[in-house]
């Protein structure tokens, strides 16, 4: 008679889930026009959570009152406490803060956009922010745009559009309208989107930023076949 002792442990659970959450719907709808709602509900295909939301999630135009952002089950609720500006594109950039509840797979570069007017501004200003002294990337720095081209705007007015640099110093300011801008970097200690403390680290670019749409034509490859007549 043969016998063996049973091993105590968890049953095999199959392969590890490496699929990030998938966005499946929202209220208001993504890309909604003439939106007046300050509360946004986002729905995903699985249970999710937010990681370091206060560091990673950026609302543009910037909000003086910190938005309320909560994850529950398969939903994320965003409550914008500032009044909405008319005829303005709003972008809630989550970066990689949204992850699935079990394995922590991130939904990378996810952003939600709506407009309080009749159109969505779709241009982006992207780049990399480096420390001038050693050319190392700067993480977590606010990068913002001013359409007011006076130098005094930087320390008198809040940014109009913003983004935050990642661990490689990269940033992408979304929802930018056509026009001319000055761009600045700011380690915003008091979170008022304005340079008003001498201790705050700053960065700037000498040239104006003029985003524009470019038409690109893609040429497909054609194969030329020679057919001989009989």
Segments predicted by a language model, with ranges:
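Acidic, low-complexity Ser/Thr/Gly/Pro-rich repeat segments typical of extracellular/periplasmic
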Residues: 5-168, 172-175, 180-186, 198-204
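Intrinsic N-terminal pre-sequences and regulatory tails
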Residues: 6, 216-223
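Acidic carboxylate motifs that coordinate Ca2+ or other divalent cations, activating on Asp/Glu
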Residues: 192
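Short, composition-biased linear "edge" segments at structural boundaries
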Residues: 205-214
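Residue-level detector of conserved catalytic or cofactor/ligand-binding positions
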Residues: 222-230
